[in-house]
Design a protein with these regions (language model features):
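Short loop/edge segments at beta-strand edges and connector loops
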Residues: 88, 174-176
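N-terminal lobe of the biotin/lipoate ligase/transferase fold
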Residues: 2-165, 188
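Long, positively charged amphipathic alpha-helical accessory segments at protein N-termini or as interdomain linkers
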Residues: 1-30, 40, 44-45, 145-148, ...
Length: 321
């Protein structure tokens, strides 16, 4: 870790509180001059740091510059050793994570970015990824066999909701299976993919990618997405902490994807219960009413005929097709 990153990580742990120059120098085994230079470098990068004589330095609660050091400082102690690869801009964090996985990146590796130039959603759809967002992918290494990717997606959706609620008064909800909504608009999408080793033909890893819309100015939302895409605009929201909280929960949940509490939490946050939806099955347009979510994470839909279908995948729209 560089001197600059070490200073940032220390300030991140005490965000909103003054830390004296001598304390920083002593705890990090640095000279006062080295601390001062690191502070100047961080300010030049856009971090909001207040310096007051006889008080020290304070990383402001409104400072929201995403960084590897900031994410690392916000991770729980047991996940502090996770490797973090940060990009200001990248094509896709999932693409980078797949490459790293095939190169031998360990379980728990985190890939994060402030902007994606080729973000992807399900079925290869483009994912709007402006530079104010949070795009984070976690590499998971199954100990044996292939876990149900839908349950990983479920864990990620719950992780996003919990992480947002930990920092704000916002109450996000989940639209089956992989979208998080706020006030009727999509603020997060999730893409879970398997990484296949071409030589062995086996599953090398699973990457779970999460894209969160943060502080997007209304004028930057493309016309075709107006009224559909929303944004987290809470004061004091830290993307570094959001990334750390999401990654930590996904890693914890991965150890027990069948835990009843996980699917119960997912059900509680779903806003589709009782709503009429439209979907396609084998090319046929169908409509029905959502009656629940199974323990496996399937969407239960009652058709007009009285038959109940269990949907394990696919897109659903609110209202009739």
């Amino acid at each position: 870790m560089t001197t600059k990153d070490a200073v940032l990580a220390f300030l991140e742990k005490d965000r909103g509180r003054f830390v004296s120059g001598p304390e920083l120098a002593e705890k990090l085994s640095l000279s006062r001059t080295a601390v001062w230079k690191a502070i100047r470098a961080l300010e030049a990068e856009g971090h909001e740091i207040t310096a007051v004589k006889n008080k020290g330095y304070r990383l402001e609660t409104g400072s929201d510059r995403l960084s590897a050091a900031g994410i690392s400082a916000c991770l729980p102690e047991k996940h502090r050793t996770c490797a973090i690869h940060f990009f200001e801009t990248t094509d896709s964090t999932n693409t980078q994570a797949k490459r790293l996985a095939l190169e031998g990146a360990p379980h728990g590796t985190i890939v994060a970015a402030s902007e994606q130039t080729a973000g992807r959603g399900r079925s290869g759809k483009a994912f709007f990824s402006p530079d104010t967002g949070l795009y984070v992918t976690v590499i998971l290494k199954p100990p044996a066999g292939m876990p149900d990717p839908q349950k990983i997606t479920i864990a990620a959706a719950v992780a996003v909701c919990r992480a947002v609620e930990a920092q704000t008064a916002l109450k996000p909800q989940i639209k089956w299976v992989n979208d998080v909504y706020l006030d009727g608009k999509k603020v997060c999408g999730i893409l879970t993919e398997a990484v296949t080793d071409l030589e062995s033909g086996g599953i090398n890893s699973i990457v779970v990618g999460i894209g969160v819309n943060c502080a997007i100015p209304a004028e930057r939302i493309p016309k075709e997405l107006v009224g559909i895409v929303g944004s987290l605009n809470a004061e004091g929201l830290s993307r570094s902490r959001l990334a750390a909280d999401i990654a930590a929960f996904v890693l914890d949940a991965f150890d027990d994807l069948d835990a009843p509490a996980l699917i119960d939490d997912y059900r509680r946050r779903s806003f589709l219960f009782g709503k009429e939806i439209g979907f396609k099955r084998n090319g046929e347009a169908l409509n029905g009413t959502v009656t629940g979510i199974s323990d496996a994470g399937n969407l239960l839909v009652r058709l007009g005929s009285g038959e109940t279908l269990s949907l394990s995948s696919g897109e659903v729209t609110i209202g009739k097709l």
